[in-house]
């Protein structure tokens, strides 16, 4: 498979720069790979795609205001950090700019010294391990000094930080939002639950690699980034019960899919309480063991996320659906519209 097989034309003006005023007012394209039908609707009608006895699985990670601007304590040169993951204690892996000036031992100050960082290790591609020093609680200091790490294709300033969080965001740790969940409102979730659908939460902390383009021609040579996930025993039991009773596992977003499939692959299609790092790469040819249907946003051309959707619904049909979305002026990427995909019945 060639990376160019997953390319498509996307006018730049269709890349959503700001969220809609009402979360669930976004458009929803429902696609069925078996009948090859496509239906244009709105996200608040996603409830029509869910049946009593199904489980809706959402990623409750919370985005950290992970972009920090500071200065080197010796030269006062400007420095930018993007926090990627907490390695241990007060140590974090960060993406640093300009990295070449930040050798081991370099100190960086943020917010007039309220937060300082010492470089303890140099990594590839501008990565650094740093140890932070501060007074009080780290997350509170970060909330006051940090900025939301919006994706590189969003150029507008975000007026309200909460619009880059899902309404059910709970577990701190992501460098990017699980954007398929941004469309849900508390009222919509209440209606879905009242219909007899189980609401289930897992956690996968989204890393910066989610935006990393595929730089190789041969898809099989691409290496996925690792992300940390957790599924509780209660959630696993609920999902196994739903499956056993003939209900569907409906995932919200690619992060939920990757978590469920990672665990399902470990335990022969069953789910158990589990946590760890996953670098699962789902591409055409992959056999799904857990997920029966899902919602997702519209993704970048040639991205691993388009490949994942293609693994589920077929590359040609997915590209047809994307072409339809472009013609119908759907909004793309993080603040854009959504797609609901049912699973081919022959699998």
UniProtKB/Swiss-Prot annotation:
Q: Subunit notes for this chain?
A: Monomer.
Enzyme Commission number(s) of this protein: 2.4.99.17
The cross-references to Pfam families, in alphabetical order and at most eight, read: Queuosine_synth (PF02547)
Q: Which InterPro entries match?
A: QueA, QueA_dom1, QueA_dom2, QueA_sf
Q: Which terms does the record give in the GO molecular function aspect?
A: S-adenosylmethionine:tRNA ribosyltransferase-isomerase activity
What HAMAP family does the record tag this protein with? QueA
Function noted in UniProt? Transfers and isomerizes the ribose moiety from AdoMet to the 7-aminomethyl group of 7-deazaguanine (preQ1-tRNA) to give epoxyqueuosine (oQ-tRNA).
What are the UniProt keywords, alphabetically? Cytoplasm, Queuosine biosynthesis, S-adenosyl-L-methionine, Transferase
Q: In which pathway does it act?
A: tRNA modification; tRNA-queuosine biosynthesis
Q: What does the record give as the reaction this protein catalyses?
A: 7-aminomethyl-7-carbaguanosine(34) in tRNA + S-adenosyl-L-methionine = epoxyqueuosine(34) in tRNA + adenine + L-methionine + 2 H(+)
**Protein family:** Belongs to the QueA family.
Question: What name does this protein carry?
Answer: S-adenosylmethionine:tRNA ribosyltransferase-isomerase
One GO CC annotation, please? Answer: cytoplasm
Q: Which GO terms describe its biological process?
A: queuosine biosynthetic process; tRNA wobble guanine modification
Leader sequence segment: none
Q: Which organism is it from?
A: Streptococcus thermophilus (strain ATCC BAA-491 / LMD-9)
Q: Where in the cell is it found?
A: Cytoplasm
Top-level EC class:
transferase
């Amino acid at each position: 498979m060639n990376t160019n097989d997953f390319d498509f034309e996307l006018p730049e003006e269709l890349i959503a720069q700001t969220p809609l005023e009402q979360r669930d007012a976004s458009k929803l394209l429902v696609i069925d790979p078996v009948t090859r039908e496509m239906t244009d609707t709105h996200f608040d009608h996603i409830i029509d795609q869910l049946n009593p006895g199904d489980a809706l699985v959402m990623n409750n990670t919370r985005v950290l205001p992970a972009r920090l601007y500071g200065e080197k304590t010796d030269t006062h040169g400007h420095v930018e950090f993007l926090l990627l993951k907490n390695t241990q204690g007060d140590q974090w892996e960060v993406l640093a700019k300009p990295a070449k000036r930040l050798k081991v031992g370099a100190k960086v100050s943020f917010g007039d010294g309220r937060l300082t960082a010492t470089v303890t290790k140099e990594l590839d591609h501008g990565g650094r391990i740093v140890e932070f020093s501060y007074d009080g609680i780290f997350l509170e200091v970060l909330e006051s000094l940090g900025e939301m790490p919006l994706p590189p294709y969003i150029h507008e300033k975000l007026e309200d930080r909460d619009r880059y969080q899902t309404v059910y965001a709970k577990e701190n740790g992501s460098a990017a939002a699980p954007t398929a969940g941004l469309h849900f409102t508390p009222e919509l979730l209440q209606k879905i639950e009242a219909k007899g659908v189980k609401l289930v939460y897992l956690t996968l902390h989204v890393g910066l690699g989610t935006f990393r383009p595929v730089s190789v021609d041969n898809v099989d040579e691409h290496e996925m980034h690792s992300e940390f996930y957790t599924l509780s025993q209660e959630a696993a039991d609920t999902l196994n019960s739903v499956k056993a009773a003939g209900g569907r596992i409906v995932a919200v977003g690619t992060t939920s899919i990757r978590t469920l499939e990672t665990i399902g692959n470990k335990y022969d299609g069953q789910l158990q309480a589990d946590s760890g790092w996953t670098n699962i790469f789902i591409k055409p040819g992959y056999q799904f063991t857990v997920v029966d249907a899902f919602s997702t946003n519209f993704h970048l051309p040639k991205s691993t996320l388009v490949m994942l959707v293609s693994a589920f619904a077929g590359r040609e049909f997915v590209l047809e659906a994307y072409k339809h979305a472009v013609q119908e002026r759907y909004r793309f990427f993080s603040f854009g519209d959504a797609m609901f995909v049912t699973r081919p019945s022959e699998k």
